[in-house]
Amino acid sequence: MVKLFGKSKKKEESPQSIDIAFQSILDEIGVVETEKKHLMATMDTVRKQQLIQSYSSKKFSKNEFGNKSKKKSIITQSPHYFVDCLKNDPSKEVLTSLRVRLGNQPLKWLKEFLSLDGVSLLIKVLILNEIKQVKNQEDIYKIAQCLHSLKLIMNTKFGLESVIKQPTNIHSISLVMDTPHLKTRIMVIELLAALCVVNSKGLPLVLSAMDNYREVKREKKPFIHLFQGLKNPSGSLQATTFALINTLISSSQSVEERQKIRNQFKKLGITKVIEELEPEYANNPDLATQKDLYEQECRWDEQEQIENARGDISDENPEALVKAILDRTAGGPLYSSFTSILRLLANSITDQTKDQSLSNYLFVEKVIGKMNNGESYLDDIGTFFGGGGGGDGSLDIAHVSGEKAVLIQKEIEDLKKQKKRDQDKLAEKDKLLTKLAKRMRKMEEAIKLGKGLEYLNNQIEIESPPDSSTSTPQETTPGGTKVPLKTSPVTKADLKHKLSTFTTAKAPNGVSDFLSGLDTTNQQGSTDASQTEAGSGDGIPLPPGAPPPPPPPGGKLAPSTPQLCSRPPSIKMKSYQWTRYRTRNVTNTFWKNVNLTKYNDCLPHEQIEGLFGAAIFEKKEKELKKGSEVTVIDTKRAQNIGILLSRFKNVTHDAIYDAIYSLDESILDLETINQFIKYIPSKEEIDCIIAFKQQQEQLPEEERMKLGKSEIFIDKISTIPRLEQRIQALHFKLNFPDKLYHAKPDIRKFNEAFVQLQNNNIFAIMELILSIGNFINFGTNRGNASGFKIDSINKMADTKSNIREKYTLVHYLIELLESTQPELLKVFDEIPSVVDAATLSFNQSSSEIKLLRAGLIKLEKEIFVRQPKSVEPKPDDETINNNGEDDINNTSSDEKTEGQQQRQGEEEENDESESTGNSFADSLKKKKSQVNTNSTSDSKQSLEPLKDDDPLKLKLSEFLLASKTELDDTETLIAETEVLFKSICKFFGEDSTKIQPEEFLAIFKKFNDKFIMSKKDLEIEKSIKDKSTQRKNEKERKEMEIKKSKLEMIHSKLKKIGSPSSSNRILASNESSPTSSTSSVVHQHDDEDEETIKEYINNPSPSQQSNSSEEEGMMDDLLNLIRDGNFRELRRMNLQQKKPVRTKRVIAKQPTRPQALDTPSSTYSSISSIYDAEPLDMSDQEDEDEEEEEDEEEEEEEEEGDDDNDNDEEEGEN
């Protein structure tokens, strides 16, 4: 019986046709070539046929069957549909649907979308919404969906190439960095970070986009907006921002380029921000990872720069360093500048101990150091040129150790004193020259105006020269000889009377007629001449009837112009600056007809005199001068003493006098006495004040002038016996504890350091290093060593691995100790004093103790040694310098020459090398013998002995006893430390005479620093690996959960198929089709098979990415590496690319990026996977769920053969 409604039996397919069909399916879903070959070779024909049927049935059920709504769904899911929508301001629903399709559809769909210029349209939509001045929630949502779609496109290689084809696309993406929405901002930064490392063109494109952002947003500084992300309270944004900063720095292959970008962020203050974020690192491990990575990369780049600059040159070899710089600059623009710098430095060298040369070199070193670190050095330049190298004129010699520092300091102080004296003399000469110039100018003006005698009279009244009481007036006789005048004093009243008599005397008529025929100028000149002659004679005016000198013989006098003014002014008038016409100039002008005497009688002369009379200041000056204060000593010194006196509030001069005499420490505390020591009055100042007082006593009471406050104070305390010695003794006493307790702990620290160096763990590490070194140097001249010089431990960091980046012999030593002898890793925790003492100076501390001992000996000698009374020594022999430090070299007036001091220093050095532990004591004995030898010369200028009840003797006796005990203990400690140093140097094979204690300890400190940093590097590397492993395990766990849920769904469907109704349906189908039994089995594996195929696409391994042509998911993998800080892996991947050399950035329609890398900023955090789930918290996931639910409903529809759910599907789509 023929089955009318039965299906004909299908023809069996050949294996070749099955392979072709299976290969086409693999091509359609985008399986990579390597996996495609693997599947084709390993999978049997039956399994291939099952996969083909499973894929075909799903495709057939989705795309072929259904009503009109299903056909409509096919259209709305096509790339053409989305491209058309993007051209016409798409809605947020369309953009969401496009994002879902880009994530779910096969690569063939994506390629078709890209071929229709979908990227450009997406960028256009992004720009249109970004440029809006006011953005609403929908605009922000659209921007987020566009960015998410672009990220999905860039997740494949051909999609990435389509995006970076136009550099303006990256420009447009970077402009969204200022969006207020946090997740969108984070996504932009993540895209930029991944782009830096995913392609060789990525870093130039991103830097170009930063430049474009800076220009468009009009930012003043590069990267400023990106940098602000570190200050955002969001931890995710902070970590992502820091990740982008590290990516921008570390992605470049050139260390110079990396340092340039890093310096840009240093100028923005990233170092300070890293310190401010310290509390956040504990709660934000991603941020802590990025911080550690930044510091590590910075340290590595600095080391690499040094190595590149010097090659194998040592830092301690200046000749090799100069040669290396010359080799690098030869033939370039820097050569001439470098040569000029060397020439200037050579010309500036005068003497290594001169403070100016040393100051200049220290200044140059400081400025260049700040330039290399990207720090500002303008303040240092201003301070150096404005303040002589420092705010207080001091010189930084802290790094100079030992007696050399003492000699330098002494010479500096001597030069300062000499400079001060020279400046004072020059200032006095300048003042004197100025006074003389003013007097000459005034006298010339007075002579021209005919008032020479009046000017001299005023000078006599105003000024009284100091030697006026001793000088004798002289008169000049007609013969030119000078004879003394009478010694009777001339009072001011007599001079005024004579002056008025001289100026008001009238000439006889004959003289008047004679003068009336002279010209006005001649008349004035003759008057001046007569007055000058009178003033230069004996001072007695001419009698009233005496005629003036006759005119020159043979001369004809010109007619004079008649006097046009009726009377002269009674007072001196201001001048009217007109240009006068003479009679001969007004002949043909209207002035010829003017009545010159018309207003002589009616002119208000008194009113004019009151309004325009010249101001008279003589009386006011006399009032100011009378009883005014006078500064006798140097003005600046007097001002400083006045400032010092202002410290004594509510303390009178008598109280200060008593405090100095009795050494009262309650009034003269440490800070006050340190200032007081600088202004001890000198003998010249005291003599000048005494002379001034004697001069003023000879003047009348009303004409005496007062001393200034500073001079009164000096005059008061100058009567204290042994004033200078008392102030110096109190200064020494108050400063003794501070100096002793500053030097003694440093010496004790050296003592402890040398004891700690005898640690057995140190020797164990040295043994291990020796074994490693002999193995590495086997067969070379350096091999087969029985030991090594101790500073060789710092050269371990120069031996680097050729496999692991930045991995040195120090890293290997740490890993070896961790695996074999972990207890040795804490060796440096057992020697803390070694690290601390390496930054101190043993010679400087011991020299300080020597100075204190010498000061005690001198003080004891002055107080207790009874000597005959003699002339008081001059203040120039002071034993304490202006900085408050004892100058033991001035204890005698017969100071040693430099040659003697040098020979003495050589003898002391020879004694130190010969002695064994007693060098300090021997030098101290020598110093004592010097003091005793010079005592005979001191006796000539010594003072009378102190009385037993003198406070100076009473108070200092107890101090001397206590201080001697303290100094003895310290000197014993110094001797013990010297012995320890020599023994430890001998133990390590070093010569103690050729190395300083602090230099020896610095070797271990430097190795300790490298050991700690290398250990930190390994910890960071381990942390990166742990995080990567954790992410991988988490990813595998999620995949297993997905597979488990899929299997459960399959089992549930199988159970459903195995139900009675389903069994009947299967039997009916079996009767109608013999092949349906196979299809039912195939259908059970539909989901499993599709999941298996897509697994090869969605989870490619990093190793496959380099060989893949269409790899998918690579952006996520790169972001994970960036978050973990695994830039070593990123650089390794870049080296495996075909073109590892980075090309220059191509900036379309933009100016070429300058070398200085002045780029703007952006921000960063990690949310790639989070954003996939919740892009904007705007029900985006709900839209995606609706799409998935729609697909599941279609699947159930096909399995059950039920067409009644079409309406439900339409509602789901809507």
Swiss-Prot record:
Record's compositionally biased regions (Basic and acidic residues): 868-877
One GO term of the biological process aspect: actin filament polymerization
Region feature (Disordered): 462-490, 507-569, 868-948, 1026-1045, 1054-1089, 1133-1214
Compositional bias ranges of the Low complexity kind: 1161-1171
Domain FH1: from-to ranges: 457-544
GO molecular function list: actin filament binding; profilin binding; small GTPase binding
Domain DAD stretches: 1065-1095
GO terms for cellular component: actin cytoskeleton
Subunit-level organization: Interacts (via GBD/FH3 domain) with activated Rho-GTPases.
Function: Formins play an important role in the nucleation of actin and the formation of linear actin filaments.
Name the UniProt record assigns to this protein: Formin-D
